[in-house]
Amino acid sequence: MSTFEKPQIIVHIQKGLNYTVFDSKWVPCSAKFVTMGNFARGTGVIQVYEIQRGDLKLLREIEKAKPIKCGTFGAASLQQRFLATGDFGGNLHIWNLEAPEMPVYSVKGHKEIINTIDGVGGLGIGEGAPEIVTGSRDGTVKVWDPRQKEDPVANMEPAQGENKRDCWTVAFGNAYNQEERVVCAGYDNGDIKLFDLRNMSLRWETNIKNGVCSLEFDRKDISMNKLVATSLEGKFHVFDMRTQHPTKGFASVTEKAHKSTVWQVRHLPQNREIFLTTGGAGSLHLWKYEYPTQRSKKDSEGLEMGVAGSVSLLQNVTVSTQPISSLDWSPDKRGLCVCSSFDQMVRVLIVTKLQTI
């Protein structure tokens, strides 16, 4: 692919903020996004921005008692577009951003900080009930139904006597009908665990030897296809989730990408073979996954096992000197994304030529 044909990653707008920003998410069906974080005085903040004539307009600033670590619209209806957040106090809140004084849902979900959150069943993505999953430093992963107060519908915690590991990332997947749904969780010691929510069992686990920073299925609402896991030592792994071997599990390909921690992975909503990873030194890498000619083969005992594909780097660019801790593609406009970094900046990026790859 010549330089002229390659996608370009362009910083469209950048804005300095007066707080540490941990997460950023597009508001579905709009030119707006939210940023979440904490002020130096120790309180939490949610800001709503809108893109107007090539600039960012602050529409609303909401201050809360506890610093806000993560957020998702994934369990909200397209009509309401409520934001679910996890904070440093272990609280799960759901906010109506039009009237944010009091949360529409509130539960003390965890004993310690909620590091990570994901949603499914809202926004027309995924069959079945709307659900939120949270992962915490307290070692537990909990699934919540916003229509049901107080208690989680599922609680994945270490058995008694087991060490509690810090859960850094969670992701929903396999939500292709009313019954099926999985949660994948990644931990600070390199463990990846796949929980089947239909029969409440641990379906698969592996260890990638370094802390798991980010997990994402290429699509939440299809039969599991691919899972990307990023880690501390600059590596990421792509698992082919179509074929599970009874002892070897899922086939995977590993790529050494950034020179430092790979903080995030996000698949392009309009093409599941393309994904962006963000690095600890402010870099963004755009990748394409290529399937092998055959996705499965039989082993010596006649059992089906998966065959991993390959990844190719389409483009990379450095936009900051600090880790890019959050990234979100616009679900509506191909190639538009928002990212935030620890230099207290939020950036709107445009990735070109994605329709021709």
UniProtKB/Swiss-Prot annotation:
First and last residue of the signal peptide: none
Species annotation: Mus musculus
Keywords: Apoptosis, Cytoplasm, Repeat, WD repeat
This protein's name: Dynein axonemal assembly factor 10
GO CC terms in record: dynein axonemal particle; RPAP3/R2TP/prefoldin-like complex
Protein's UniProt keywords contain Metal-binding: no
GO biological process, one term: apoptotic process
Top-level taxon of origin: Eukaryota
Gene3D superfamilies: YVTN repeat-like/Quinoprotein amine dehydrogenase (2.130.10.10)
WD repeats: 63-105, 115-154, 162-205, 207-249, 257-297, 319-357
Subcellular location as annotated: Dynein axonemal particle
InterPro entries attached to this UniProt entry: WD40/YVTN_repeat-like_dom_sf, WD40_repeat_dom_sf, WD40_rpt
SUBUNIT field: Component of the PAQosome complex which is responsible for the biogenesis of several protein complexes and which consists of R2TP complex members RUVBL1, RUVBL2, RPAP3 and PIH1D1, URI complex members PFDN2, PFDN6, PDRG1, UXT and URI1 as well as ASDURF, POLR2E and DNAAF10/WDR92. Interacts with PIH1D1; the interaction associates DNAAF10 with the R2TP complex. Interacts with several dynein axonemal assembly factors.
Pfam families, A to Z: WD40
